[in-house]
Amino acid sequence: MKKISLPKIGIRPVIDGRRMGVRESLEEQTMNMAKATAALITEKIRHACGAQVECVIADTCIAGMAESAACEEKFSSQNVGVTITVTPCWCYGSETIDMDPMRPKAIWGFNGTERPGAVYLAAALAAHSQKGIPAFSIYGHDVQDADDTSIPADVEEKLLRFARAGLAVASMKGKSYLSVGGVSMGIAGSIVDHNFFESWLGMKVQAVDMTELRRRIDQKIYDEAELEMALAWADKNFRYGEDQNASQYKRNEAQNRAVLKESLLMAMCIRDMMQGNKTLADKGLVEESLGYNAIAAGFQGQRHWTDQYPNGDTAEALLNSSFDWNGVREPFVVATENDSLNGVAMLFGHQLTGTAQIFADVRTYWSPEAVERVTGQALSGLAEHGIIHLINSGSAALDGACKQRDSEGKPTMKPHWEISQQEADACLAATEWCPAIHEYFRGGGYSSRFLTEGGVPFTMTRVNIIKGLGPVLQIAEGWSVELPKAMHDQLDARTNSTWPTTWFAPRLTGKGPFTDVYSVMANWGANHGVLTIGHVGADFITLAAMLRIPVCMHNVEEAKIYRPSAWAAHGMDIEGQDYRACQNYGPLYKR
Protein backbone atom coordinates (compact mmCIF):
# COMPACT_ATOMS: atom_id res chain seq x y z
CA MET A 1 0.00 0.00 0.00
CA LYS A 2 1.34 3.43 -0.94
CA LYS A 3 2.54 5.51 2.00
CA ILE A 4 0.64 8.76 2.56
CA SER A 5 2.82 11.76 1.74
CA LEU A 6 3.64 14.41 4.31
CA PRO A 7 2.03 17.85 4.00
CA LYS A 8 4.13 20.58 2.43
CA ILE A 9 4.26 24.34 2.94
CA GLY A 10 3.37 26.44 -0.08
CA ILE A 11 5.10 29.78 -0.59
CA ARG A 12 3.15 32.34 -2.63
CA PRO A 13 5.20 35.33 -3.90
CA VAL A 14 2.71 38.06 -4.83
CA ILE A 15 3.55 41.11 -6.92
CA ASP A 16 2.23 44.31 -8.46
CA GLY A 17 1.08 43.20 -11.91
CA ARG A 18 1.67 46.46 -13.80
CA ARG A 19 4.12 45.84 -16.62
CA MET A 20 6.38 48.35 -18.36
CA GLY A 21 8.65 48.71 -15.37
CA VAL A 22 6.77 48.06 -12.13
CA ARG A 23 6.49 44.26 -12.12
CA GLU A 24 9.83 43.81 -13.81
CA SER A 25 11.61 45.80 -11.09
CA LEU A 26 10.09 43.63 -8.35
CA GLU A 27 10.35 40.09 -9.75
CA GLU A 28 13.75 39.23 -8.32
CA GLN A 29 13.16 40.77 -4.89
CA THR A 30 9.77 39.10 -4.53
CA MET A 31 10.95 35.66 -5.59
CA ASN A 32 13.99 35.99 -3.32
CA MET A 33 11.66 36.60 -0.37
CA ALA A 34 9.92 33.34 -1.22
CA LYS A 35 13.20 31.46 -1.51
CA ALA A 36 14.50 32.90 1.77
CA THR A 37 11.30 31.89 3.55
CA ALA A 38 11.50 28.36 2.17
CA ALA A 39 15.18 28.07 3.12
CA LEU A 40 14.48 29.22 6.68
CA ILE A 41 11.68 26.71 7.19
CA THR A 42 13.60 23.84 5.62
CA GLU A 43 16.60 24.56 7.84
CA LYS A 44 14.79 25.14 11.13
CA ILE A 45 11.74 22.85 11.16
CA ARG A 46 11.13 19.15 10.80
CA HIS A 47 7.99 17.08 10.71
CA ALA A 48 7.19 15.23 13.93
CA CYS A 49 8.44 12.06 12.24
CA GLY A 50 11.83 13.73 11.76
CA ALA A 51 11.59 14.23 8.00
CA GLN A 52 12.69 17.52 6.51
CA VAL A 53 9.86 19.91 5.69
CA GLU A 54 9.44 20.46 1.98
CA CYS A 55 8.40 23.87 0.69
CA VAL A 56 6.74 24.38 -2.70
CA ILE A 57 7.13 27.79 -4.33
CA ALA A 58 4.70 29.00 -6.98
CA ASP A 59 6.18 28.79 -10.48
CA THR A 60 5.75 32.53 -11.01
CA CYS A 61 4.99 35.57 -8.94
CA ILE A 62 1.25 36.06 -8.48
CA ALA A 63 -0.27 39.29 -9.73
CA GLY A 64 -3.90 38.33 -10.22
CA MET A 65 -6.54 35.67 -10.67
CA ALA A 66 -4.86 33.64 -13.41
CA GLU A 67 -1.53 33.23 -11.67
CA SER A 68 -3.28 32.63 -8.35
CA ALA A 69 -5.26 29.78 -9.94
CA ALA A 70 -2.11 28.31 -11.47
CA CYS A 71 -0.44 28.39 -8.07
CA GLU A 72 -3.43 26.68 -6.48
CA GLU A 73 -3.37 23.94 -9.10
CA LYS A 74 0.29 23.27 -8.35
CA PHE A 75 -0.29 23.26 -4.59
CA SER A 76 -3.27 20.92 -4.89
CA SER A 77 -1.18 18.39 -6.78
CA GLN A 78 1.65 18.45 -4.23
CA ASN A 79 -0.22 18.06 -0.93
CA VAL A 80 0.36 21.61 0.27
CA GLY A 81 -1.35 21.94 3.64
CA VAL A 82 -0.12 25.37 4.77
CA THR A 83 0.60 28.56 2.82
CA ILE A 84 2.69 31.66 3.38
CA THR A 85 2.21 34.62 1.05
CA VAL A 86 5.18 37.00 0.78
CA THR A 87 5.59 40.39 -0.86
CA PRO A 88 7.73 43.53 -0.68
CA CYS A 89 5.21 45.72 -2.50
CA TRP A 90 1.66 46.71 -3.24
CA CYS A 91 -0.41 43.98 -4.92
CA TYR A 92 -4.10 43.50 -5.60
CA GLY A 93 -5.59 42.28 -2.31
CA SER A 94 -8.51 39.92 -2.83
CA GLU A 95 -7.26 38.97 -6.30
CA THR A 96 -4.08 37.39 -4.97
CA ILE A 97 -4.95 35.83 -1.60
CA ASP A 98 -5.17 32.13 -0.79
CA MET A 99 -8.90 31.36 -0.59
CA ASP A 100 -8.78 27.79 0.76
CA PRO A 101 -10.81 28.13 4.00
CA MET A 102 -9.32 25.08 5.72
CA ARG A 103 -5.63 25.70 5.07
CA PRO A 104 -3.68 27.73 7.65
CA LYS A 105 -2.31 30.84 5.98
CA ALA A 106 -0.02 33.75 6.76
CA ILE A 107 1.09 36.86 4.89
CA TRP A 108 4.51 38.45 5.28
CA GLY A 109 4.52 42.05 4.12
CA PHE A 110 8.07 43.40 3.90
CA ASN A 111 8.61 46.52 6.03
CA GLY A 112 10.30 48.80 3.53
CA THR A 113 9.82 52.34 2.25
CA GLU A 114 10.51 51.99 -1.46
CA ARG A 115 7.40 49.87 -2.06
CA PRO A 116 4.36 49.58 0.26
CA GLY A 117 4.49 45.94 1.42
CA ALA A 118 2.62 46.98 4.56
CA VAL A 119 -0.20 48.43 2.49
CA TYR A 120 -0.73 45.15 0.65
CA LEU A 121 -0.57 43.27 3.95
CA ALA A 122 -3.32 45.45 5.41
CA ALA A 123 -5.46 45.26 2.27
CA ALA A 124 -5.12 41.49 1.98
CA LEU A 125 -5.89 40.94 5.66
CA ALA A 126 -8.97 43.13 5.31
CA ALA A 127 -10.13 40.89 2.47
CA HIS A 128 -9.49 37.79 4.56
CA SER A 129 -11.49 39.26 7.44
CA GLN A 130 -14.37 40.32 5.23
CA LYS A 131 -14.55 36.89 3.59
CA GLY A 132 -14.35 34.99 6.89
CA ILE A 133 -11.03 33.31 6.10
CA PRO A 134 -8.64 34.26 8.95
CA ALA A 135 -4.96 34.77 8.17
CA PHE A 136 -1.88 35.50 10.25
CA SER A 137 -0.04 38.80 9.82
CA ILE A 138 3.75 39.00 9.64
CA TYR A 139 5.28 42.48 9.55
CA GLY A 140 8.78 43.34 10.75
CA HIS A 141 9.16 45.83 13.58
CA ASP A 142 11.96 47.76 11.89
CA VAL A 143 12.22 49.23 8.39
CA GLN A 144 14.59 47.35 6.07
CA ASP A 145 16.35 48.58 2.96
CA ALA A 146 15.01 47.27 -0.33
CA ASP A 147 18.17 45.26 -1.00
CA ASP A 148 18.26 43.73 2.50
CA THR A 149 17.59 40.02 1.99
CA SER A 150 17.89 39.05 5.66
CA ILE A 151 14.92 37.88 7.71
CA PRO A 152 14.69 39.89 10.95
CA ALA A 153 14.49 37.96 14.21
CA ASP A 154 10.90 39.00 14.95
CA VAL A 155 9.79 37.98 11.46
CA GLU A 156 11.63 34.67 11.77
CA GLU A 157 9.94 33.93 15.09
CA LYS A 158 6.49 34.44 13.59
CA LEU A 159 7.28 32.51 10.42
CA LEU A 160 8.51 29.52 12.40
CA ARG A 161 5.72 29.60 14.98
CA PHE A 162 3.15 29.77 12.21
CA ALA A 163 4.86 26.98 10.26
CA ARG A 164 5.09 24.65 13.27
CA ALA A 165 1.44 25.11 14.16
CA GLY A 166 0.27 25.00 10.55
CA LEU A 167 2.08 21.73 9.91
CA ALA A 168 0.48 20.27 13.03
CA VAL A 169 -2.95 21.17 11.65
CA ALA A 170 -2.14 19.69 8.24
CA SER A 171 -0.56 16.55 9.72
CA MET A 172 -3.59 15.71 11.85
CA LYS A 173 -6.10 16.19 9.05
CA GLY A 174 -7.32 12.91 7.60
CA LYS A 175 -5.79 10.76 10.35
CA SER A 176 -7.63 8.82 13.03
CA TYR A 177 -7.77 8.43 16.79
CA LEU A 178 -7.78 4.74 17.67
CA SER A 179 -10.06 4.15 20.65
CA VAL A 180 -9.20 0.71 22.04
CA GLY A 181 -12.05 0.01 24.42
CA GLY A 182 -14.57 2.48 25.76
CA VAL A 183 -15.08 4.56 28.88
CA SER A 184 -12.59 3.89 31.67
CA MET A 185 -13.92 4.27 35.21
CA GLY A 186 -16.28 7.08 34.21
CA ILE A 187 -13.45 9.36 33.04
CA ALA A 188 -15.05 12.02 30.83
CA GLY A 189 -12.11 12.22 28.45
CA SER A 190 -12.68 8.59 27.52
CA ILE A 191 -16.23 9.39 26.40
CA VAL A 192 -14.74 9.87 22.94
CA ASP A 193 -16.46 12.74 21.12
CA HIS A 194 -16.50 11.97 17.39
CA ASN A 195 -17.79 15.44 16.52
CA PHE A 196 -14.83 17.07 18.25
CA PHE A 197 -12.31 15.02 16.30
CA GLU A 198 -14.15 15.51 13.01
CA SER A 199 -15.09 19.19 13.27
CA TRP A 200 -12.09 20.67 15.07
CA LEU A 201 -9.21 18.37 14.04
CA GLY A 202 -10.35 16.92 10.71
CA MET A 203 -9.82 13.42 12.10
CA LYS A 204 -11.90 10.27 12.34
CA VAL A 205 -12.38 8.02 15.35
CA GLN A 206 -11.75 4.30 14.93
CA ALA A 207 -13.50 2.46 17.77
CA VAL A 208 -12.16 -1.04 18.43
CA ASP A 209 -13.17 -3.30 21.29
CA MET A 210 -10.41 -4.57 23.57
CA THR A 211 -11.28 -8.08 22.41
CA GLU A 212 -9.45 -7.22 19.18
CA LEU A 213 -6.26 -6.83 21.18
CA ARG A 214 -7.00 -10.14 22.90
CA ARG A 215 -7.58 -11.80 19.51
CA ARG A 216 -4.30 -10.55 18.09
CA ILE A 217 -2.37 -11.82 21.10
CA ASP A 218 -4.12 -15.19 21.33
CA GLN A 219 -4.05 -15.91 17.59
CA LYS A 220 -0.44 -14.73 17.16
CA ILE A 221 -1.33 -11.87 14.85
CA TYR A 222 2.08 -10.30 15.32
CA ASP A 223 5.69 -10.71 14.26
CA GLU A 224 6.91 -13.65 16.35
CA ALA A 225 10.56 -12.94 15.57
CA GLU A 226 10.12 -9.38 16.82
CA LEU A 227 8.61 -10.67 20.06
CA GLU A 228 11.76 -12.68 20.73
CA MET A 229 13.84 -9.58 20.03
CA ALA A 230 11.68 -7.52 22.41
CA LEU A 231 11.99 -10.10 25.18
CA ALA A 232 15.78 -10.25 24.79
CA TRP A 233 15.92 -6.45 24.88
CA ALA A 234 13.82 -6.33 28.06
CA ASP A 235 16.01 -9.00 29.67
CA LYS A 236 19.04 -6.85 28.98
CA ASN A 237 17.61 -3.45 29.89
CA PHE A 238 14.80 -3.82 32.43
CA ARG A 239 15.73 -3.19 36.04
CA TYR A 240 13.00 -4.46 38.34
CA GLY A 241 11.81 -2.56 41.40
CA GLU A 242 10.25 -3.54 44.68
CA ASP A 243 7.20 -5.79 44.70
CA GLN A 244 4.95 -4.12 47.28
CA ASN A 245 2.18 -6.68 47.00
CA ALA A 246 1.13 -8.85 49.91
CA SER A 247 2.62 -12.34 49.81
CA GLN A 248 -0.57 -13.97 48.54
CA TYR A 249 -0.54 -11.68 45.50
CA LYS A 250 3.12 -12.02 44.54
CA ARG A 251 3.75 -13.92 41.32
CA ASN A 252 6.41 -16.56 40.78
CA GLU A 253 9.11 -16.33 38.13
CA ALA A 254 7.10 -18.12 35.44
CA GLN A 255 4.06 -15.96 36.07
CA ASN A 256 6.16 -12.79 35.94
CA ARG A 257 7.65 -13.94 32.65
CA ALA A 258 4.17 -14.44 31.21
CA VAL A 259 3.14 -10.95 32.36
CA LEU A 260 6.22 -9.42 30.73
CA LYS A 261 5.60 -11.29 27.48
CA GLU A 262 1.98 -10.18 27.30
CA SER A 263 2.92 -6.58 28.15
CA LEU A 264 5.38 -6.46 25.26
CA LEU A 265 2.84 -8.09 22.97
CA MET A 266 0.32 -5.42 23.90
CA ALA A 267 2.81 -2.76 22.82
CA MET A 268 3.46 -4.51 19.52
CA CYS A 269 -0.21 -5.12 18.75
CA ILE A 270 -1.38 -1.61 19.65
CA ARG A 271 1.39 -0.24 17.44
CA ASP A 272 0.35 -2.52 14.59
CA MET A 273 -3.26 -1.47 15.02
CA MET A 274 -2.22 2.17 14.79
CA GLN A 275 0.14 2.16 11.83
CA GLY A 276 0.00 -1.30 10.32
CA ASN A 277 2.79 -3.82 9.84
CA LYS A 278 3.69 -5.29 6.47
CA THR A 279 5.11 -8.39 8.18
CA LEU A 280 1.54 -9.43 8.93
CA ALA A 281 0.73 -9.36 5.22
CA ASP A 282 3.59 -11.79 4.66
CA LYS A 283 1.76 -14.14 7.06
CA GLY A 284 -1.43 -13.83 4.99
CA LEU A 285 -3.03 -11.33 7.39
CA VAL A 286 -3.51 -8.57 4.86
CA GLU A 287 -6.45 -6.82 6.54
CA GLU A 288 -4.69 -6.64 9.90
CA SER A 289 -1.47 -5.49 8.25
CA LEU A 290 -3.02 -2.19 7.16
CA GLY A 291 -3.70 -0.72 10.60
CA TYR A 292 -6.14 2.10 11.20
CA ASN A 293 -4.17 5.17 10.00
CA ALA A 294 -4.00 6.35 13.62
CA ILE A 295 -1.86 9.33 14.61
CA ALA A 296 -2.94 8.85 18.25
CA ALA A 297 -4.61 6.15 20.31
CA GLY A 298 -6.01 5.40 23.72
CA PHE A 299 -6.36 2.17 25.68
CA GLN A 300 -9.23 1.81 28.16
CA GLY A 301 -7.60 -0.86 30.28
CA GLN A 302 -9.32 -0.24 33.57
CA ARG A 303 -11.18 -2.11 34.62
CA HIS A 304 -12.61 -4.52 32.09
CA TRP A 305 -9.13 -5.53 30.90
CA THR A 306 -6.97 -5.00 33.97
CA ASP A 307 -9.13 -7.05 36.34
CA GLN A 308 -8.10 -10.11 34.32
CA TYR A 309 -5.10 -9.28 32.11
CA PRO A 310 -1.82 -7.35 32.58
CA ASN A 311 -2.33 -3.61 32.61
CA GLY A 312 -1.28 -1.25 29.84
CA ASP A 313 1.47 0.54 31.75
CA THR A 314 4.44 -1.17 30.11
CA ALA A 315 2.92 -1.05 26.63
CA GLU A 316 1.93 2.61 26.94
CA ALA A 317 5.22 3.68 28.50
CA LEU A 318 7.25 2.04 25.73
CA LEU A 319 5.03 3.28 22.91
CA ASN A 320 5.07 6.84 24.26
CA SER A 321 8.87 6.77 24.52
CA SER A 322 11.37 7.62 21.79
CA PHE A 323 13.00 4.19 21.82
CA ASP A 324 12.37 0.48 22.22
CA TRP A 325 13.92 -2.80 21.04
CA ASN A 326 14.11 -1.37 17.51
CA GLY A 327 16.29 1.51 18.71
CA VAL A 328 15.57 5.23 18.72
CA ARG A 329 12.41 6.11 16.79
CA GLU A 330 9.48 8.51 16.72
CA PRO A 331 7.34 8.21 19.86
CA PHE A 332 3.74 7.16 19.49
CA VAL A 333 0.88 8.97 21.22
CA VAL A 334 -1.11 6.57 23.40
CA ALA A 335 -3.42 7.88 26.12
CA THR A 336 -3.88 6.00 29.35
CA GLU A 337 -7.45 5.03 30.24
CA ASN A 338 -8.44 6.07 26.71
CA ASP A 339 -8.51 9.71 27.85
CA SER A 340 -8.84 11.00 24.31
CA LEU A 341 -8.74 14.66 25.34
CA ASN A 342 -5.42 14.21 27.11
CA GLY A 343 -4.38 12.22 24.06
CA VAL A 344 -5.13 15.26 21.91
CA ALA A 345 -2.97 17.44 24.17
CA MET A 346 -0.21 14.84 23.78
CA LEU A 347 -0.72 14.90 20.03
CA PHE A 348 -0.47 18.69 19.92
CA GLY A 349 2.75 18.62 21.96
CA HIS A 350 4.33 15.91 19.84
CA GLN A 351 3.42 17.56 16.55
CA LEU A 352 4.81 20.92 17.70
CA THR A 353 8.09 19.61 19.14
CA GLY A 354 8.80 16.12 17.81
CA THR A 355 9.36 14.98 21.40
CA ALA A 356 7.83 12.34 23.64
CA GLN A 357 5.09 13.46 26.03
CA ILE A 358 4.55 12.83 29.74
CA PHE A 359 1.01 11.69 30.53
CA ALA A 360 0.23 12.18 34.22
CA ASP A 361 -2.43 12.51 36.85
CA VAL A 362 -2.56 16.03 38.26
CA ARG A 363 -2.55 14.31 41.61
CA THR A 364 -1.75 16.56 44.57
CA TYR A 365 -1.02 20.18 45.46
CA TRP A 366 1.57 20.38 48.22
CA SER A 367 1.63 23.76 49.96
CA PRO A 368 4.88 24.90 51.61
CA GLU A 369 3.14 24.58 54.98
CA ALA A 370 1.96 21.02 54.34
CA VAL A 371 5.39 19.92 53.12
CA GLU A 372 7.08 21.34 56.20
CA ARG A 373 4.50 19.74 58.50
CA VAL A 374 4.98 16.31 56.94
CA THR A 375 8.73 16.32 56.31
CA GLY A 376 10.12 18.89 58.71
CA GLN A 377 11.85 20.56 55.75
CA ALA A 378 11.01 23.77 53.90
CA LEU A 379 10.52 24.05 50.15
CA SER A 380 12.97 26.37 48.39
CA GLY A 381 14.01 27.65 44.98
CA LEU A 382 11.51 26.99 42.21
CA ALA A 383 9.40 25.04 44.70
CA GLU A 384 9.16 27.77 47.36
CA HIS A 385 5.50 28.60 46.61
CA GLY A 386 4.37 24.97 46.51
CA ILE A 387 4.43 22.11 44.03
CA ILE A 388 2.08 19.86 42.10
CA HIS A 389 2.69 16.12 42.16
CA LEU A 390 2.32 14.75 38.63
CA ILE A 391 2.17 10.97 38.79
CA ASN A 392 0.43 8.15 36.97
CA SER A 393 0.57 4.39 37.19
CA GLY A 394 3.54 4.05 34.89
CA SER A 395 2.54 5.01 31.35
CA ALA A 396 4.60 8.21 31.07
CA ALA A 397 7.28 8.29 28.37
CA LEU A 398 10.61 7.08 29.74
CA ASP A 399 12.18 10.18 28.18
CA GLY A 400 10.57 11.94 31.15
CA ALA A 401 13.45 10.91 33.39
CA CYS A 402 15.31 13.69 31.52
CA LYS A 403 18.56 11.79 31.17
CA GLN A 404 19.08 13.28 27.72
CA ARG A 405 21.27 16.38 27.51
CA ASP A 406 21.03 19.62 25.53
CA SER A 407 23.95 21.51 23.96
CA GLU A 408 24.80 23.01 27.37
CA GLY A 409 24.75 19.65 29.12
CA LYS A 410 21.46 20.33 30.89
CA PRO A 411 18.75 17.68 31.35
CA THR A 412 16.03 17.72 28.71
CA MET A 413 13.80 15.68 26.41
CA LYS A 414 15.03 15.88 22.83
CA PRO A 415 13.28 15.45 19.50
CA HIS A 416 13.80 11.81 18.65
CA TRP A 417 16.11 12.57 15.72
CA GLU A 418 18.61 14.16 18.14
CA ILE A 419 18.63 11.34 20.71
CA SER A 420 21.67 9.07 20.86
CA GLN A 421 21.46 5.40 21.78
CA GLN A 422 23.49 6.24 24.89
CA GLU A 423 20.82 8.73 26.00
CA ALA A 424 18.08 6.18 25.39
CA ASP A 425 20.03 3.67 27.48
CA ALA A 426 20.41 6.26 30.25
CA CYS A 427 16.64 6.75 30.39
CA LEU A 428 16.16 2.99 30.63
CA ALA A 429 18.80 2.74 33.34
CA ALA A 430 16.97 5.43 35.34
CA THR A 431 13.73 3.43 35.21
CA GLU A 432 12.61 0.63 37.48
CA TRP A 433 9.81 -1.74 36.53
CA CYS A 434 7.69 -2.48 39.56
CA PRO A 435 5.07 -5.24 39.77
CA ALA A 436 1.63 -3.67 39.54
CA ILE A 437 -0.26 -3.20 42.79
CA HIS A 438 -2.85 -5.97 43.02
CA GLU A 439 -5.54 -3.78 44.57
CA TYR A 440 -5.51 -1.65 41.42
CA PHE A 441 -4.51 -4.21 38.80
CA ARG A 442 -5.68 -7.75 39.54
CA GLY A 443 -4.33 -8.99 36.24
CA GLY A 444 -0.82 -7.84 37.07
CA GLY A 445 1.57 -5.87 34.94
CA TYR A 446 4.63 -3.70 35.43
CA SER A 447 4.62 0.00 36.21
CA SER A 448 7.58 2.13 35.18
CA ARG A 449 9.11 4.17 38.00
CA PHE A 450 11.42 7.14 37.50
CA LEU A 451 11.94 10.63 38.90
CA THR A 452 12.14 13.60 36.53
CA GLU A 453 15.29 15.67 37.02
CA GLY A 454 14.73 19.17 38.36
CA GLY A 455 15.08 22.58 36.74
CA VAL A 456 13.74 21.48 33.36
CA PRO A 457 11.28 23.86 31.63
CA PHE A 458 7.94 22.24 30.82
CA THR A 459 4.54 23.26 29.49
CA MET A 460 1.55 21.47 30.99
CA THR A 461 -1.57 21.29 28.81
CA ARG A 462 -5.04 19.80 28.72
CA VAL A 463 -8.04 19.89 26.38
CA ASN A 464 -11.51 19.87 27.94
CA ILE A 465 -14.96 19.89 26.35
CA ILE A 466 -17.59 22.22 27.83
CA LYS A 467 -21.22 21.63 26.90
CA GLY A 468 -22.58 24.62 25.01
CA LEU A 469 -19.09 25.96 24.34
CA GLY A 470 -17.02 23.16 22.86
CA PRO A 471 -13.34 22.38 23.40
CA VAL A 472 -11.04 24.64 25.41
CA LEU A 473 -7.30 24.43 26.01
CA GLN A 474 -5.43 24.96 29.28
CA ILE A 475 -1.73 25.84 29.39
CA ALA A 476 0.63 26.20 32.35
CA GLU A 477 4.33 26.84 31.78
CA GLY A 478 6.68 25.96 34.62
CA TRP A 479 9.57 23.77 35.69
CA SER A 480 10.26 20.36 37.12
CA VAL A 481 11.62 20.53 40.65
CA GLU A 482 14.25 18.46 42.40
CA LEU A 483 13.47 17.88 46.07
CA PRO A 484 15.92 16.71 48.73
CA LYS A 485 15.92 12.92 48.67
CA ALA A 486 14.45 12.48 52.13
CA MET A 487 11.65 14.93 51.33
CA HIS A 488 10.89 13.23 48.02
CA ASP A 489 10.85 9.79 49.58
CA GLN A 490 8.40 10.86 52.29
CA LEU A 491 6.02 12.62 49.92
CA ASP A 492 6.25 9.97 47.20
CA ALA A 493 5.51 7.16 49.63
CA ARG A 494 2.21 8.79 50.60
CA THR A 495 0.84 8.14 47.08
CA ASN A 496 2.47 5.20 45.30
CA SER A 497 6.22 4.90 45.12
CA THR A 498 6.07 2.36 42.27
CA TRP A 499 4.97 5.03 39.78
CA PRO A 500 6.91 7.75 37.90
CA THR A 501 6.96 11.20 39.51
CA THR A 502 7.44 14.75 38.26
CA TRP A 503 7.36 17.56 40.81
CA PHE A 504 6.03 20.58 38.93
CA ALA A 505 6.14 24.27 39.82
CA PRO A 506 4.10 26.49 37.46
CA ARG A 507 5.27 30.02 36.70
CA LEU A 508 3.07 32.40 38.67
CA THR A 509 1.76 35.76 37.45
CA GLY A 510 -0.11 36.88 40.55
CA LYS A 511 -3.37 37.00 38.59
CA GLY A 512 -6.37 34.71 38.09
CA PRO A 513 -5.58 31.00 37.96
CA PHE A 514 -1.86 31.82 38.29
CA THR A 515 -2.23 33.80 41.50
CA ASP A 516 -0.57 30.92 43.32
CA VAL A 517 0.18 27.23 42.81
CA TYR A 518 -3.01 26.21 44.60
CA SER A 519 -5.04 28.20 42.06
CA VAL A 520 -3.38 26.39 39.16
CA MET A 521 -4.37 23.05 40.66
CA ALA A 522 -7.86 24.29 41.56
CA ASN A 523 -8.52 25.60 38.05
CA TRP A 524 -7.24 22.52 36.20
CA GLY A 525 -10.16 21.12 34.24
CA ALA A 526 -9.64 17.38 34.64
CA ASN A 527 -7.69 14.71 36.48
CA HIS A 528 -5.05 14.35 33.75
CA GLY A 529 -2.50 16.64 32.12
CA VAL A 530 0.41 16.45 29.69
CA LEU A 531 3.95 17.76 30.05
CA THR A 532 5.71 18.93 26.89
CA ILE A 533 9.37 19.91 27.06
CA GLY A 534 10.18 23.62 26.96
CA HIS A 535 8.17 26.78 27.42
CA VAL A 536 6.15 26.32 24.25
CA GLY A 537 2.80 27.67 25.36
CA ALA A 538 2.90 30.29 22.60
CA ASP A 539 3.01 27.54 19.97
CA PHE A 540 0.00 25.86 21.58
CA ILE A 541 -1.90 29.17 21.52
CA THR A 542 -1.21 29.65 17.80
CA LEU A 543 -2.25 26.07 17.03
CA ALA A 544 -5.43 26.43 19.08
CA ALA A 545 -6.37 29.60 17.19
CA MET A 546 -5.95 27.81 13.87
CA LEU A 547 -8.33 25.08 15.06
CA ARG A 548 -10.71 27.60 16.70
CA ILE A 549 -10.17 26.19 20.19
CA PRO A 550 -10.20 29.03 22.76
CA VAL A 551 -7.56 29.07 25.48
CA CYS A 552 -9.23 29.34 28.87
CA MET A 553 -6.10 29.45 31.03
CA HIS A 554 -2.46 30.29 30.31
CA ASN A 555 0.57 32.09 31.71
CA VAL A 556 2.27 32.97 28.42
CA GLU A 557 3.68 36.48 28.05
CA GLU A 558 1.34 38.67 26.01
CA ALA A 559 4.11 39.65 23.59
CA LYS A 560 4.43 36.01 22.49
CA ILE A 561 0.74 35.48 21.75
CA TYR A 562 0.23 35.07 18.01
CA ARG A 563 -3.24 34.67 16.54
CA PRO A 564 -4.91 35.56 13.22
CA SER A 565 -5.26 39.29 12.56
CA ALA A 566 -9.08 39.11 12.58
CA TRP A 567 -9.02 38.29 16.30
CA ALA A 568 -8.25 41.99 16.94
CA ALA A 569 -11.69 42.94 15.61
CA HIS A 570 -13.43 40.89 18.28
CA GLY A 571 -12.90 43.32 21.18
CA MET A 572 -10.04 44.88 23.13
CA ASP A 573 -9.38 42.12 25.67
CA ILE A 574 -7.14 39.57 23.94
CA GLU A 575 -8.55 36.54 25.77
CA GLY A 576 -12.12 37.69 25.17
CA GLN A 577 -11.15 38.19 21.52
CA ASP A 578 -10.12 34.56 21.38
CA TYR A 579 -13.47 33.29 22.67
CA ARG A 580 -15.52 35.56 20.42
CA ALA A 581 -13.45 34.79 17.32
CA CYS A 582 -13.57 31.03 17.89
CA GLN A 583 -17.34 31.24 18.36
CA ASN A 584 -17.75 33.47 15.31
CA TYR A 585 -15.75 31.32 12.90
CA GLY A 586 -16.64 27.97 14.41
CA PRO A 587 -14.56 24.79 14.17
CA LEU A 588 -12.11 24.63 11.28
CA TYR A 589 -13.83 21.67 9.62
CA LYS A 590 -17.42 22.54 10.49
CA ARG A 591 -20.08 21.12 8.20
UniProtKB/Swiss-Prot annotation:
Disulfide bridges in this chain: none
Binding annotation for Mn(2+): 337, 361, 528
Pfam families: Fucose_iso_C, Fucose_iso_N1, Fucose_iso_N2
Gene Ontology biological-process annotations: D-arabinose catabolic process; L-fucose catabolic process
Catalytic machinery residues: 337, 361
Cofactor(s) in the UniProt record: Mn(2+)
Subcellular location per the Swiss-Prot or TrEMBL entry: Cytoplasm
Coiled-coil parts of chain: none
Entry keywords, A to Z: Carbohydrate metabolism, Cytoplasm, Fucose metabolism, Isomerase, Manganese, Metal-binding
Pathway named in the protein's UniProt entry: Carbohydrate degradation; L-fucose degradation; L-lactaldehyde and glycerone phosphate from L-fucose: step 1/3
One GO term describing the cellular component: cytoplasm
Catalyzed reaction equations: L-fucose = L-fuculose
Subunit relationships: Homohexamer.
Job description of the protein: Converts the aldose L-fucose into the corresponding ketose L-fuculose.
Similarity field: Belongs to the L-fucose isomerase family.
Protein name: L-fucose isomerase
Species of provenance: Salmonella typhimurium (strain LT2 / SGSC1412 / ATCC 700720)
Gene: fucI
